Swiss-Prot record:
PROSITE patterns: MGS. The IMP cyclohydrolase activity resides in the N-terminal region. It comes from Polynucleobacter asymbioticus (strain DSM 18221 / CIP 109841 / QLW-P1DMWA-1) (Polynucleobacter necessarius subsp. asymbioticus). The keyword Transferase applies. One of its GO terms (molecular function) is IMP cyclohydrolase activity. This is Bifunctional purine biosynthesis protein PurH.
Protein backbone atom coordinates (compact mmCIF):
# COMPACT_ATOMS: atom_id res chain seq x y z
CA UNK A 1 0.00 0.00 0.00
CA UNK A 2 1.24 3.47 -0.89
CA UNK A 3 1.47 5.83 2.07
CA UNK A 4 4.39 8.09 1.12
CA UNK A 5 5.45 9.49 -2.25
CA UNK A 6 8.60 11.39 -3.22
CA UNK A 7 8.19 13.73 -6.19
CA UNK A 8 11.07 15.51 -7.95
CA UNK A 9 10.53 16.34 -11.61
CA UNK A 10 12.09 18.57 -14.25
CA UNK A 11 9.03 18.09 -16.48
CA UNK A 12 6.27 19.71 -14.43
CA UNK A 13 3.54 18.70 -16.89
CA UNK A 14 0.64 17.21 -14.93
CA UNK A 15 2.50 17.01 -11.63
CA UNK A 16 0.21 19.36 -9.68
CA UNK A 17 -3.09 17.56 -10.40
CA UNK A 18 -1.34 14.23 -9.85
CA UNK A 19 0.01 15.38 -6.47
CA UNK A 20 -3.43 16.73 -5.53
CA UNK A 21 -4.96 13.34 -6.24
CA UNK A 22 -2.29 11.64 -4.14
CA UNK A 23 -2.99 14.05 -1.29
CA UNK A 24 -6.71 13.37 -1.55
CA UNK A 25 -5.89 9.67 -1.27
CA UNK A 26 -4.20 10.42 2.06
CA UNK A 27 -0.64 10.03 0.80
CA UNK A 28 2.21 12.01 2.36
CA UNK A 29 4.13 14.12 -0.16
CA UNK A 30 7.91 14.60 -0.05
CA UNK A 31 9.67 16.76 -2.61
CA UNK A 32 12.76 18.75 -3.55
CA UNK A 33 13.65 22.21 -4.84
CA UNK A 34 11.47 23.56 -7.62
CA UNK A 35 8.94 20.74 -7.41
CA UNK A 36 8.40 21.33 -3.69
CA UNK A 37 7.99 25.06 -4.31
CA UNK A 38 5.42 24.43 -7.06
CA UNK A 39 3.38 22.07 -4.89
CA UNK A 40 3.45 24.49 -1.96
CA UNK A 41 2.30 27.32 -4.22
CA UNK A 42 -0.70 25.16 -5.06
CA UNK A 43 -1.56 24.75 -1.38
CA UNK A 44 -0.38 21.18 -1.10
CA UNK A 45 1.26 20.05 2.16
CA UNK A 46 4.74 18.96 1.22
CA UNK A 47 7.77 17.85 3.23
CA UNK A 48 11.11 19.10 1.89
CA UNK A 49 13.72 16.36 1.50
CA UNK A 50 16.11 18.48 3.55
CA UNK A 51 13.66 18.24 6.47
CA UNK A 52 13.61 14.48 6.05
CA UNK A 53 17.38 14.05 5.85
CA UNK A 54 18.14 16.77 8.41
CA UNK A 55 20.79 17.88 5.93
CA UNK A 56 20.52 20.89 3.62
CA UNK A 57 20.86 20.75 -0.15
CA UNK A 58 24.47 21.55 -0.99
CA UNK A 59 26.89 22.05 -3.88
CA UNK A 60 24.34 24.01 -5.93
CA UNK A 61 21.81 21.20 -5.60
CA UNK A 62 24.21 18.44 -6.62
CA UNK A 63 23.64 16.73 -3.28
CA UNK A 64 20.11 16.58 -1.92
CA UNK A 65 18.70 13.03 -2.16
CA UNK A 66 21.93 11.01 -1.89
CA UNK A 67 21.21 10.09 1.72
CA UNK A 68 20.29 6.93 3.71
CA UNK A 69 17.00 8.56 4.80
CA UNK A 70 15.98 8.50 1.13
CA UNK A 71 17.66 5.39 -0.23
CA UNK A 72 16.91 3.35 2.88
CA UNK A 73 13.23 4.18 2.47
CA UNK A 74 13.33 3.13 -1.18
CA UNK A 75 15.45 -0.03 -0.92
CA UNK A 76 14.10 -1.69 2.24
CA UNK A 77 12.22 -4.93 1.57
CA UNK A 78 8.95 -4.78 3.49
CA UNK A 79 8.88 -8.58 3.78
CA UNK A 80 12.37 -8.73 5.34
CA UNK A 81 12.05 -8.23 9.14
CA UNK A 82 15.72 -7.31 9.46
CA UNK A 83 15.26 -4.52 6.86
CA UNK A 84 12.27 -3.10 8.68
CA UNK A 85 14.08 -3.34 12.02
CA UNK A 86 17.00 -1.38 10.57
CA UNK A 87 14.64 1.35 9.36
CA UNK A 88 13.05 1.58 12.80
CA UNK A 89 16.44 1.69 14.51
CA UNK A 90 17.56 4.64 12.37
CA UNK A 91 14.23 6.45 12.22
CA UNK A 92 13.76 5.95 8.48
CA UNK A 93 10.29 5.86 6.93
CA UNK A 94 9.50 3.81 3.86
CA UNK A 95 8.97 5.61 0.55
CA UNK A 96 6.35 3.71 -1.44
CA UNK A 97 6.16 5.80 -4.59
CA UNK A 98 8.84 7.67 -6.51
CA UNK A 99 7.95 10.18 -9.23
CA UNK A 100 11.01 11.48 -11.07
CA UNK A 101 12.20 12.57 -14.46
CA UNK A 102 15.81 13.37 -15.13
CA UNK A 103 17.70 16.52 -16.01
CA UNK A 104 17.16 17.26 -19.72
CA UNK A 105 20.59 16.16 -20.94
CA UNK A 106 19.56 15.33 -24.51
CA UNK A 107 17.62 18.56 -24.91
CA UNK A 108 20.59 20.52 -23.57
CA UNK A 109 23.23 19.05 -25.88
CA UNK A 110 20.87 19.40 -28.85
CA UNK A 111 21.25 23.19 -28.55
CA UNK A 112 23.78 24.66 -30.95
CA UNK A 113 25.25 26.98 -28.34
CA UNK A 114 25.58 24.32 -25.63
CA UNK A 115 28.85 24.55 -23.72
CA UNK A 116 30.70 21.63 -22.19
CA UNK A 117 29.86 23.05 -18.76
CA UNK A 118 26.14 23.16 -19.65
CA UNK A 119 26.28 19.53 -20.73
CA UNK A 120 28.04 18.37 -17.58
CA UNK A 121 25.68 20.28 -15.28
CA UNK A 122 22.75 18.50 -16.92
CA UNK A 123 24.08 15.04 -16.08
CA UNK A 124 21.69 13.87 -13.39
CA UNK A 125 23.22 11.93 -10.50
CA UNK A 126 20.68 11.71 -7.70
CA UNK A 127 17.76 11.06 -10.05
CA UNK A 128 19.13 7.90 -11.69
CA UNK A 129 20.33 6.64 -8.29
CA UNK A 130 16.83 6.94 -6.85
CA UNK A 131 15.20 5.51 -9.96
CA UNK A 132 17.44 2.46 -9.94
CA UNK A 133 16.88 1.95 -6.20
CA UNK A 134 13.11 2.14 -6.56
CA UNK A 135 13.05 -0.03 -9.68
CA UNK A 136 15.24 -2.65 -8.01
CA UNK A 137 12.75 -2.77 -5.14
CA UNK A 138 9.72 -2.77 -7.47
CA UNK A 139 8.05 -5.39 -5.28
CA UNK A 140 7.39 -2.63 -2.76
CA UNK A 141 7.86 0.65 -4.64
CA UNK A 142 5.91 2.17 -7.52
CA UNK A 143 8.20 4.29 -9.71
CA UNK A 144 7.02 6.70 -12.41
CA UNK A 145 9.15 8.57 -14.94
CA UNK A 146 6.53 9.81 -17.38
CA UNK A 147 3.38 11.94 -17.01
CA UNK A 148 1.60 9.45 -19.27
CA UNK A 149 1.71 6.94 -16.40
CA UNK A 150 0.04 9.21 -13.84
CA UNK A 151 -3.58 8.56 -14.82
CA UNK A 152 -3.48 4.74 -15.10
CA UNK A 153 -1.59 4.37 -11.82
CA UNK A 154 -4.03 6.69 -10.04
CA UNK A 155 -6.96 4.74 -11.44
CA UNK A 156 -5.47 1.48 -10.15
CA UNK A 157 -4.82 3.00 -6.73
CA UNK A 158 -8.37 4.31 -6.42
CA UNK A 159 -9.78 0.94 -7.39
CA UNK A 160 -7.57 -0.96 -4.93
CA UNK A 161 -7.30 1.21 -1.80
CA UNK A 162 -3.91 2.71 -2.74
CA UNK A 163 -2.42 -0.64 -3.73
CA UNK A 164 -0.58 -0.99 -7.04
CA UNK A 165 -0.21 -4.52 -8.39
CA UNK A 166 3.12 -6.29 -8.78
CA UNK A 167 2.43 -6.58 -12.51
CA UNK A 168 2.16 -2.81 -12.84
CA UNK A 169 5.19 -2.17 -10.65
CA UNK A 170 7.30 -4.60 -12.69
CA UNK A 171 6.23 -2.96 -15.96
CA UNK A 172 7.16 0.45 -14.55
CA UNK A 173 10.51 -0.87 -13.31
CA UNK A 174 11.35 -2.24 -16.77
CA UNK A 175 10.56 1.18 -18.19
CA UNK A 176 12.90 2.81 -15.66
CA UNK A 177 15.89 0.59 -16.43
CA UNK A 178 15.40 1.11 -20.17
CA UNK A 179 15.23 4.86 -19.55
CA UNK A 180 18.34 5.07 -17.36
CA UNK A 181 20.27 2.89 -19.83
CA UNK A 182 19.28 5.22 -22.65
CA UNK A 183 20.17 8.26 -20.54
CA UNK A 184 23.63 6.95 -19.69
CA UNK A 185 24.12 5.88 -23.31
CA UNK A 186 23.37 9.40 -24.49
CA UNK A 187 25.93 10.82 -22.07
CA UNK A 188 28.57 8.31 -23.21
CA UNK A 189 27.81 9.05 -26.88
CA UNK A 190 28.14 12.78 -26.33
CA UNK A 191 31.32 12.75 -24.26
CA UNK A 192 33.09 10.25 -26.53
CA UNK A 193 32.26 12.42 -29.56
CA UNK A 194 34.13 15.42 -28.13
CA UNK A 195 37.71 16.17 -29.06
CA UNK A 196 40.46 17.21 -26.67
CA UNK A 197 39.33 20.83 -26.98
CA UNK A 198 35.83 19.87 -25.72
CA UNK A 199 34.33 22.03 -28.47
CA UNK A 200 30.60 21.29 -28.70
CA UNK A 201 30.30 22.45 -32.31
CA UNK A 202 33.35 20.47 -33.45
CA UNK A 203 32.29 17.16 -31.93
CA UNK A 204 32.40 14.10 -34.17
CA UNK A 205 29.23 12.65 -35.63
CA UNK A 206 30.73 9.25 -34.82
CA UNK A 207 31.51 8.80 -31.10
CA UNK A 208 34.20 6.44 -29.87
CA UNK A 209 31.47 4.28 -28.37
CA UNK A 210 27.99 4.12 -29.86
CA UNK A 211 24.99 3.34 -27.65
CA UNK A 212 21.67 2.85 -29.42
CA UNK A 213 18.18 2.55 -27.98
CA UNK A 214 15.03 1.34 -29.71
CA UNK A 215 11.67 0.15 -28.45
CA UNK A 216 9.84 -2.89 -29.74
CA UNK A 217 6.76 -2.30 -31.85
CA UNK A 218 5.93 -5.93 -32.58
CA UNK A 219 7.24 -9.44 -32.92
CA UNK A 220 6.60 -10.98 -36.32
CA UNK A 221 5.52 -14.41 -37.46
CA UNK A 222 8.87 -14.73 -39.21
CA UNK A 223 11.63 -12.68 -40.80
CA UNK A 224 12.77 -12.31 -44.37
CA UNK A 225 12.20 -16.06 -44.74
CA UNK A 226 9.93 -18.41 -42.75
CA UNK A 227 12.84 -20.07 -40.92
CA UNK A 228 14.00 -16.69 -39.52
CA UNK A 229 12.55 -15.02 -36.42
CA UNK A 230 12.05 -11.25 -36.42
CA UNK A 231 10.76 -8.17 -34.62
CA UNK A 232 10.32 -4.51 -35.50
CA UNK A 233 11.89 -1.87 -33.27
CA UNK A 234 11.52 1.87 -33.66
CA UNK A 235 13.55 4.85 -32.52
CA UNK A 236 12.55 6.20 -29.12
CA UNK A 237 11.79 9.47 -30.90
CA UNK A 238 11.22 8.77 -34.63
CA UNK A 239 11.95 11.72 -36.89
CA UNK A 240 9.13 13.64 -38.52
CA UNK A 241 7.76 11.76 -41.53
CA UNK A 242 9.45 8.43 -40.73
CA UNK A 243 7.76 5.13 -41.54
CA UNK A 244 7.78 4.23 -37.83
CA UNK A 245 5.11 6.91 -37.31
CA UNK A 246 2.58 4.87 -39.29
CA UNK A 247 -1.00 4.32 -38.19
CA UNK A 248 -2.46 1.10 -39.56
CA UNK A 249 -6.11 1.56 -40.50
CA UNK A 250 -6.86 -2.00 -41.58
CA UNK A 251 -5.36 -5.24 -42.83
CA UNK A 252 -3.28 -8.09 -41.51
CA UNK A 253 -0.27 -7.58 -39.29
CA UNK A 254 2.70 -6.16 -41.17
CA UNK A 255 5.42 -8.65 -42.00
CA UNK A 256 9.18 -8.11 -41.99
CA UNK A 257 9.24 -7.77 -45.78
CA UNK A 258 6.18 -5.51 -45.74
CA UNK A 259 7.95 -3.04 -43.46
CA UNK A 260 11.21 -3.14 -45.43
CA UNK A 261 9.41 -2.56 -48.74
CA UNK A 262 7.06 0.03 -47.24
CA UNK A 263 10.05 2.04 -46.06
CA UNK A 264 11.54 2.04 -49.57
CA UNK A 265 8.21 3.14 -51.05
CA UNK A 266 7.63 5.87 -48.49
CA UNK A 267 11.14 7.32 -48.66
CA UNK A 268 10.95 7.43 -52.46
CA UNK A 269 7.52 9.06 -52.66
CA UNK A 270 8.49 11.60 -49.96
CA UNK A 271 11.27 12.82 -52.22
CA UNK A 272 8.61 14.17 -54.58
CA UNK A 273 6.86 16.21 -51.88
CA UNK A 274 7.59 19.82 -52.78
CA UNK A 275 9.61 18.70 -55.82
CA UNK A 276 6.83 17.70 -58.21
CA UNK A 277 5.27 21.08 -58.86
CA UNK A 278 2.36 20.25 -56.60
CA UNK A 279 1.56 17.10 -58.59
CA UNK A 280 0.58 13.79 -57.07
CA UNK A 281 3.33 11.16 -56.96
CA UNK A 282 2.91 7.39 -56.81
CA UNK A 283 5.59 4.77 -56.17
CA UNK A 284 5.13 1.01 -56.56
CA UNK A 285 7.77 -1.16 -54.86
CA UNK A 286 8.62 -4.84 -55.18
CA UNK A 287 11.50 -6.40 -53.23
CA UNK A 288 12.69 -2.94 -52.11
CA UNK A 289 13.04 -1.72 -55.73
CA UNK A 290 10.73 0.69 -57.55
CA UNK A 291 8.91 -1.07 -60.37
CA UNK A 292 6.91 2.03 -61.27
CA UNK A 293 7.07 5.71 -60.34
CA UNK A 294 5.01 8.56 -61.76
CA UNK A 295 3.54 11.99 -61.12
CA UNK A 296 0.15 13.14 -62.29
CA UNK A 297 -2.64 15.65 -61.80
CA UNK A 298 -4.35 13.29 -59.33
CA UNK A 299 -3.60 10.20 -57.28
CA UNK A 300 -5.47 8.16 -59.88
CA UNK A 301 -3.43 9.46 -62.80
CA UNK A 302 -0.15 9.02 -60.92
CA UNK A 303 -1.05 5.42 -60.05
CA UNK A 304 -2.16 4.54 -63.58
CA UNK A 305 1.09 5.87 -65.04
CA UNK A 306 3.24 4.13 -62.41
CA UNK A 307 1.40 0.84 -62.94
CA UNK A 308 2.07 0.94 -66.70
CA UNK A 309 5.82 0.70 -66.15
CA UNK A 310 5.75 -2.93 -65.07
CA UNK A 311 2.26 -4.37 -64.47
CA UNK A 312 3.49 -7.90 -63.79
CA UNK A 313 5.97 -6.81 -61.10
CA UNK A 314 3.36 -4.53 -59.50
CA UNK A 315 1.33 -7.63 -58.56
CA UNK A 316 1.50 -7.97 -54.78
CA UNK A 317 3.49 -4.78 -54.46
CA UNK A 318 3.65 -1.87 -52.04
CA UNK A 319 2.09 1.41 -53.20
CA UNK A 320 2.73 4.86 -51.74
CA UNK A 321 1.28 8.30 -52.47
CA UNK A 322 2.51 11.73 -51.41
CA UNK A 323 -1.08 13.07 -51.33
CA UNK A 324 -4.30 11.69 -49.81
CA UNK A 325 -5.66 8.57 -51.50
CA UNK A 326 -9.16 9.32 -52.76
CA UNK A 327 -12.03 7.15 -53.94
CA UNK A 328 -11.08 7.23 -57.62
CA UNK A 329 -7.55 5.97 -56.92
CA UNK A 330 -8.83 3.41 -54.42
CA UNK A 331 -11.32 2.04 -56.93
CA UNK A 332 -8.59 1.50 -59.52
CA UNK A 333 -6.10 0.01 -57.04
CA UNK A 334 -8.72 -2.38 -55.66
CA UNK A 335 -8.71 -4.21 -59.01
CA UNK A 336 -5.17 -5.44 -58.28
CA UNK A 337 -3.56 -7.55 -55.55
CA UNK A 338 -1.81 -5.11 -53.22
CA UNK A 339 0.05 -5.92 -50.00
CA UNK A 340 0.36 -2.43 -48.49
CA UNK A 341 -0.95 1.01 -49.45
CA UNK A 342 0.57 4.12 -47.86
CA UNK A 343 -0.62 7.72 -47.96
CA UNK A 344 -0.69 10.80 -45.72
CA UNK A 345 -4.43 10.12 -45.38
CA UNK A 346 -7.36 8.28 -46.96
CA UNK A 347 -10.73 9.81 -47.79
CA UNK A 348 -13.86 8.22 -46.36
CA UNK A 349 -14.73 6.94 -49.84
CA UNK A 350 -11.32 5.28 -50.17
CA UNK A 351 -11.68 3.66 -46.75
CA UNK A 352 -15.12 2.33 -47.69
CA UNK A 353 -13.76 0.77 -50.89
CA UNK A 354 -10.89 -0.96 -49.10
CA UNK A 355 -13.17 -2.13 -46.30
CA UNK A 356 -14.29 -4.80 -48.76
CA UNK A 357 -10.65 -5.92 -49.08
CA UNK A 358 -9.62 -6.40 -45.47
CA UNK A 359 -6.32 -8.08 -46.35
CA UNK A 360 -5.00 -4.82 -47.82
CA UNK A 361 -2.93 -3.07 -45.20
CA UNK A 362 -3.63 0.68 -45.16
CA UNK A 363 -1.00 2.88 -43.51
CA UNK A 364 -1.39 6.58 -42.78
CA UNK A 365 1.87 8.48 -42.24
CA UNK A 366 2.15 12.27 -41.88
CA UNK A 367 4.48 13.73 -44.47
CA UNK A 368 7.79 15.12 -43.22
CA UNK A 369 11.20 15.83 -44.65
CA UNK A 370 13.44 14.84 -41.73
CA UNK A 371 16.00 12.06 -42.09
CA UNK A 372 17.39 9.53 -39.64
CA UNK A 373 20.66 10.65 -38.09
CA UNK A 374 22.38 7.47 -39.25
CA UNK A 375 21.94 4.56 -41.64
CA UNK A 376 23.13 1.20 -40.33
CA UNK A 377 24.28 -2.01 -41.96
CA UNK A 378 25.14 -5.02 -39.82
CA UNK A 379 28.26 -6.95 -40.80
CA UNK A 380 29.93 -9.90 -39.12
CA UNK A 381 31.06 -8.69 -35.70
CA UNK A 382 30.38 -5.04 -36.41
CA UNK A 383 28.19 -2.24 -37.65
CA UNK A 384 28.65 0.08 -40.61
CA UNK A 385 27.34 3.55 -39.82
CA UNK A 386 26.86 6.39 -42.28
CA UNK A 387 24.86 9.55 -42.76
CA UNK A 388 21.71 9.09 -44.86
CA UNK A 389 21.80 9.68 -48.61
CA UNK A 390 19.87 12.92 -48.24
CA UNK A 391 21.58 15.07 -50.86
CA UNK A 392 19.36 16.49 -53.58
CA UNK A 393 21.37 17.99 -56.40
CA UNK A 394 19.82 21.23 -57.62
CA UNK A 395 19.53 21.96 -61.30
CA UNK A 396 21.96 24.88 -61.06
CA UNK A 397 24.55 22.56 -59.49
CA UNK A 398 24.57 20.23 -62.49
CA UNK A 399 26.91 20.51 -65.45
CA UNK A 400 25.98 19.99 -69.07
CA UNK A 401 29.00 18.21 -70.56
CA UNK A 402 27.65 17.49 -74.05
CA UNK A 403 27.74 19.79 -77.05
CA UNK A 404 23.96 19.73 -77.25
CA UNK A 405 22.04 21.48 -74.49
CA UNK A 406 19.01 19.64 -73.10
CA UNK A 407 15.57 21.03 -73.90
CA UNK A 408 13.37 22.14 -70.96
CA UNK A 409 11.29 18.95 -71.25
CA UNK A 410 14.43 16.82 -71.34
CA UNK A 411 15.72 18.60 -68.26
CA UNK A 412 12.46 17.87 -66.42
CA UNK A 413 12.62 14.22 -67.44
CA UNK A 414 16.24 13.90 -66.35
CA UNK A 415 15.51 15.46 -62.97
CA UNK A 416 12.64 13.00 -62.53
CA UNK A 417 14.79 10.03 -63.58
CA UNK A 418 17.61 11.12 -61.27
CA UNK A 419 15.26 11.29 -58.30
CA UNK A 420 14.03 7.75 -58.98
CA UNK A 421 17.49 6.26 -59.61
CA UNK A 422 18.52 7.13 -56.06
CA UNK A 423 16.05 4.52 -54.76
CA UNK A 424 16.94 1.70 -57.18
CA UNK A 425 19.43 -0.99 -56.12
CA UNK A 426 22.80 -0.61 -57.84
CA UNK A 427 23.64 -0.88 -60.60
CA UNK A 428 20.64 1.27 -61.49
CA UNK A 429 19.42 2.46 -64.88
CA UNK A 430 16.11 4.32 -65.14
CA UNK A 431 14.31 5.45 -68.30
CA UNK A 432 11.68 8.18 -67.86
CA UNK A 433 9.47 10.43 -69.95
CA UNK A 434 6.61 12.81 -69.20
CA UNK A 435 6.66 12.21 -65.45
CA UNK A 436 6.72 8.41 -65.45
CA UNK A 437 9.23 5.60 -65.46
CA UNK A 438 9.39 3.55 -68.66
CA UNK A 439 11.95 0.92 -67.76
CA UNK A 440 13.99 0.18 -64.64
CA UNK A 441 17.11 -1.96 -64.55
CA UNK A 442 18.13 -2.82 -61.00
CA UNK A 443 20.70 -4.78 -59.06
CA UNK A 444 22.88 -6.09 -61.86
CA UNK A 445 26.59 -6.58 -61.34
CA UNK A 446 27.26 -4.95 -64.72
CA UNK A 447 25.90 -1.50 -65.56
CA UNK A 448 25.47 -2.45 -69.19
CA UNK A 449 23.32 -5.42 -68.12
CA UNK A 450 21.12 -3.07 -66.07
CA UNK A 451 20.78 -0.90 -69.17
CA UNK A 452 19.73 -3.89 -71.26
CA UNK A 453 17.30 -5.04 -68.57
CA UNK A 454 15.64 -1.63 -68.40
CA UNK A 455 15.14 -1.67 -72.17
CA UNK A 456 13.67 -5.18 -72.04
CA UNK A 457 11.30 -4.15 -69.23
CA UNK A 458 10.03 -1.22 -71.30
CA UNK A 459 9.57 -3.45 -74.35
CA UNK A 460 7.66 -6.03 -72.30
CA UNK A 461 5.35 -3.29 -71.03
CA UNK A 462 4.80 -2.00 -74.56
CA UNK A 463 6.39 1.36 -73.78
CA UNK A 464 8.48 3.27 -76.29
CA UNK A 465 11.82 4.64 -75.13
CA UNK A 466 12.15 7.02 -78.07
CA UNK A 467 13.05 10.48 -76.81
CA UNK A 468 13.28 9.32 -73.20
CA UNK A 469 15.66 10.46 -70.48
CA UNK A 470 17.91 7.95 -68.77
CA UNK A 471 19.56 8.14 -65.35
CA UNK A 472 22.46 6.09 -64.03
CA UNK A 473 23.10 6.03 -60.28
CA UNK A 474 26.87 5.96 -60.87
CA UNK A 475 29.14 6.83 -63.77
CA UNK A 476 29.31 4.81 -66.97
CA UNK A 477 32.72 3.10 -66.74
CA UNK A 478 32.75 2.43 -70.49
CA UNK A 479 30.83 3.81 -73.44
CA UNK A 480 29.03 0.48 -73.99
CA UNK A 481 26.41 1.31 -71.33
CA UNK A 482 25.70 4.67 -72.93
CA UNK A 483 25.54 3.06 -76.37
CA UNK A 484 22.89 0.61 -75.10
CA UNK A 485 20.62 3.32 -73.63
CA UNK A 486 20.93 5.55 -76.69
CA UNK A 487 20.26 2.65 -79.05
CA UNK A 488 17.26 1.91 -76.86
CA UNK A 489 15.87 5.36 -77.64
CA UNK A 490 17.16 7.77 -74.99
CA UNK A 491 17.76 11.34 -76.16
CA UNK A 492 19.47 12.54 -72.98
CA UNK A 493 21.33 11.09 -70.02
CA UNK A 494 22.08 12.13 -66.47
CA UNK A 495 24.87 10.56 -64.42
CA UNK A 496 27.40 11.54 -61.73
CA UNK A 497 30.49 11.54 -63.94
CA UNK A 498 33.87 10.85 -62.42
CA UNK A 499 35.03 7.93 -64.54
CA UNK A 500 38.61 7.70 -65.78
CA UNK A 501 36.98 7.50 -69.22
CA UNK A 502 34.69 10.52 -68.87
CA UNK A 503 36.19 12.06 -72.01
CA UNK A 504 35.38 8.89 -73.94
CA UNK A 505 31.80 8.86 -72.58
CA UNK A 506 31.31 12.55 -73.43
CA UNK A 507 32.64 11.92 -76.94
CA UNK A 508 30.14 9.06 -77.31
CA UNK A 509 27.30 11.35 -76.21
CA UNK A 510 28.34 13.91 -78.80
CA UNK A 511 28.67 11.20 -81.42
CA UNK A 512 25.09 10.13 -80.72
CA UNK A 513 23.89 13.74 -80.58
CA UNK A 514 22.35 13.41 -77.12
CA UNK A 515 22.43 15.86 -74.22
CA UNK A 516 24.28 14.67 -71.13
CA UNK A 517 24.52 16.06 -67.60
CA UNK A 518 27.01 15.34 -64.84
CA UNK A 519 25.63 15.78 -61.30
CA UNK A 520 28.86 15.20 -59.39
CA UNK A 521 26.92 13.07 -56.89
CA UNK A 522 26.73 9.27 -56.83
CA UNK A 523 23.77 7.32 -55.44
CA UNK A 524 24.94 3.74 -54.86
CA UNK A 525 22.29 1.69 -53.05
CA UNK A 526 23.18 -1.77 -51.76
Amino acid sequence: MIRTALLSVSDKNGIVPFAKSLHEQGIKLISTGGTAKLLAENNLPVVEVSSLTKFPEMLDGRVKTLHPMVHGGLLARRDFPEHMAALEEHGIDTIDMLVINLYPFNETVAKENCSFEDAVENIDIGGPAMLRAAAKNHQDVTVLISPEDYAPVLAEMKANQNVVSYKTNLALAKKVFAHTAQYDGSIANYLSALGDDLDHKARSAYPETLHLAFEKVQEMRYGENPHQSAAFYKDIYPVNGALANYKQLQGKELSYNNIADADSAWECVKSFAGNSGGAAACVIIKHANPCGVAVGASALEAYQKAFKTDPSSAFGGIIAFNIPCDGAAAQEISKQFVEVLIAPSFTDEAKAIFAAKQNVRLLEIPLGNAFNTFDFKRVGGGLLVQSPDAKNVLQNEMRVVSQRQPTPSEMNDMMFAWRVAKFVKSNAIVYCSNGMTLGIGAGQMSRVDSARMASIKAENAGLSLKGSAVASDAFFPFRDGLDVVVNGGASCAIQPGGSMRDDEIIAAANEHGIAMIFTGTRHFRH
